[in-house]
Amino acid sequence: MPKTNNQKKVNTFKNILKKQMKKTLTLLASLVLFFVASAQSNQSTNSAVNPAKDWKFGIALWTFHTFSFAESLDKVDSAGLKYIEPNNFTKTLPELNDSSLMQLSPSGIQKLKSLIEQRGLKCESVYLAGGKDIDAWKKQFEAAKQLGVQFVTTEPPLDMWDSIDSLAGIYGIKVAIHEHWKGMSHYWNPDTTLLAIKGHPNFGVCADLGHWPKSGIKPLDAIKKLSGHIIAIHLKDIAAYNNPKLVDVPVGTGVIDFPAIFRELKKQGFKGPIYIERDATDQPSNLPSVIQEVKYYNEQVSKL
């Protein structure tokens, strides 16, 4: 019996439906494979990072800037920390005429380096205040090279990105762009930092967690935006958002969600220094709060 027009329409519809089903199943299978691969990739990244081992926990010596260099090292030792980040403007040692790092001769820098090594400490970075011309920057990079650091933490002028990136390449030292708050730093907004990094292979980020809230920026959001570029962390807390006049509070007592930040850093595969840094000057010293922060950090990292 010949097929009626209705039967032909039904068969045509069935064929179309089968084709659509095949396409849908193929698409679903592809999506499943994609999500499985993504999950495996994330798991691989996470498992590849051991925070207790791969995060170099230490302190920025600015924390003890009211003390001599030797006294600062004593306090670092008392806190049980290993990695330090000095800066180029704090007085060094009486036997070096209390000169700043940038004023020292090569032999003076070697003496400072030997003192650090004798204490069993490691110095992989230094904070540079920078300068107005390339000669000033070159002098500071030269001192950083003699000190044996891997990167410098600094805030390069907007019109010197190219020249400072070139200097970094010449000296084999990375530049970790640091930020202060709005009105004090060009880099208060992570978008500016990303602009600086673009086209400058020697640039990365030193994320100061306690400064972003002063500009109304959530540190976790900034960390996510800067993923893949973070060289180091300045560990710092603050009591409230949108108040640039506030000084920091001990880590874990303010508004910053550190557990979420630590999870995000692990997810990103971050491996590098995490430096405690206090701007506040507790009396008689910041050492008690630093010890408190060390305990808090170790507790949080043990949960990752």
Can you name each region flagged by the protein language model?
Residues L101-Q118, S163-I170, I261-E264:
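Catalytic-core regions built around general acid/base machinery
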